[in-house]
Amino acid sequence: RMMELNKTIYWKPESTGTGRFGKWLENINDWNLSRSRFWGTPLPIWATEDRTELKCIGSIEELISEIEKAVAAGVMKENPYKNFKVGDMSKENYSTDNIDLHRPYVDNIILLSSKGEPMRREPDLIDVWFDSGAMPYAQVHYPFESKEGFDQIYPADFIAEGVDQTRGWFYTLHAIAVMLFDSVAFKNIISNGLVLDKNGNKMSKRLGNAVDPFDVLKKYGADATRWYMISNSQPWDNLKFDVDGVDECRRKFFGTLYNTYSFFALYANIDGFTGAEAEVPVEKRPEIDRWILSELNSLVKDVTASLEDYDPTPAARRIDQFVGENLSNWYVRLNRKRFWGGELTEDKLAAYQTLYTCLETVAMLAAPIAPFITDRIFRDLNATSGRHTEESVHLAEYPKCNEALIDAELEAMMSLAQRASSMVLALRRKVNIKVRQPLQKIIIPVLDKEMAAHIEKVRTLVMNEVNVKDIELITDTTGIITKRIKPNFKTLGPKYGKYMKQIAALVAGYTQEQIAAIEANDETILDIDGEKIVTTAADFEITSEDMPGWLVASEGKLTVALDITITDELRREGIARELVNRIQNIRKESGFEVTDKISVEIEATELTSPAVESFAKYIAQQTLAVDVKAVAAPAGQFVVDSDIDEVPLKIAVTKA
């Protein structure tokens, strides 16, 4: 019966339930319940000297009744528990002054057999694992109390402990529950792995590789520690604990989340946005708002599914990815100008409301893993908006997915923009061309009309993100982009290992058209010695070769080619953007308010003079400057030594 009921328990991982625990149940031996100890729960069994009669006492009431019989028969002088009131469940009644059921006191109790012979308690104790297994009942004094409502706490919805407990707590819980109630003691369970050192060795003070958790908590905080442990590996896997990983979580995830909130709070306070304003309908908001809200609700859906599956690791990773890639690095960065200056227009209000919703929802989603910073963000947001009556994120309802706001096509389109942008930025880094330096063009080969339509919709967005003047879409890459193909041994090997040499030889001779067909089609059938081999694009590694004056990158079905030729005009614009960066830094370091107008003087050099002449208006717009000039000797309120491309220059900034 224990094996049958075990199959109804949801084990994470499943292999522990079917393997380690299941095999243990299949080969189980009788449980030797007694232990020769002093401290613990005494066996409630009394026996005559010849062991012909045994009594197992089931309650204090029964014990006191048996003691009274023994006293009446003269076997005991008096009842040691005479002051105890049966039925009185108060702490005072259960004080050790009234009753103590431990050794040595219980050893002095002598009961009376049915034949009038004295009965003494078996001297052993109960195995402490029986105490642990009885925890569900003992914690509420069942069945002597809490009969009503017991079914609300039993069986437990969820428990977690180390995998070594398959023969300990997991077993005793299960055995007692099956014996007493023909039931399971728990419905869902995670068997935790071990925490090892960063090299995968068991931590030991003797070896000096132990990490003091209190030191980690003090230095990095509980949130970062918890997030690292949950996101780094699934709970049932062994965790190679590296303090540097905790610090990375603190900087990357929590630093990004806090900076995003700080950005929102800064401009919301300037504009007087509270979060209590009438909502701009989602359908009236810009596409970028609808996209992030779609991604947000997909996030809620994914995180909820992971947590309901008792798998918090993918949940943490999805939240991390959303905050870092979608919210901070994409939405906020592409929408900064919507928050700057001007009146609180409907467009700006939509931006505030969208970012507010994202921050609030992320705080609520992440709260079970990072309880402190999420509660701080939730409370700060709610203090001005009053959207929630609950004073803490931990009292609020968990977010629910709004399926109506999920737009899969919009997400796919924006994902394409993100991937293309990421690839172009990686190409820039490859040759040390800063993003502030504009380039002329990127070429993207399109495989079908849908891909072309998606890129057209995000054309301007990608151009702004990677700072290029144009995107050219092509269908024929002949003479422009040369691709190479080879088998992906990780995916093809397990399926067609004995044919790998033939497959490699076959695709090595593929034309550009054949390679393009593999990228475009869902499946490609190869004929190897009469054997039909079904493959997908993922079964091959397809790379692109650089062209003269261009850099090329491929990722899956997406290929981009970047023109890295810098003309004089592009160079001047790049210098202008560098000047904007330097002036913004001076504004910040000099303590200017974000709304302050300024005047700017830039030292005239061969680099700066042409740039200022061509782009003075652009520089002024970006820096809230009323005047921008290139002069021989800059003078003003703040004169700062700076440089561009390691060429020194002075910049003067004065509050206008």
Positions of PLM-derived features:
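Substrate-binding cleft of carbohydrate-active enzyme catalytic domains
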Residues: H174-M179
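Short, solvent-exposed helix-loop connector elements
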Residues: Y10-T16, D237-V246
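Residues forming anionic-ligand binding surfaces in small-molecule and nucleic-acid pockets
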Residues: R1-S15, Q152-I153, A553-E569
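Structured mid-domain segments that build the active-site/substrate or prosthetic-cofactor binding neighborhood
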Residues: Y228-S231
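Cytochrome P450 core scaffold surrounding the K-helix E-X-X-R motif
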Residues: Q139-F144
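A short glycine/serine-rich beta->alpha loop
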Residues: I153-D164
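Feature 926 captures the class I aminoacyl-tRNA synthetase adenylation module centered on the KMSKS loop
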Residues: K23-F130, A134-P136, L180-A222, D237, ...
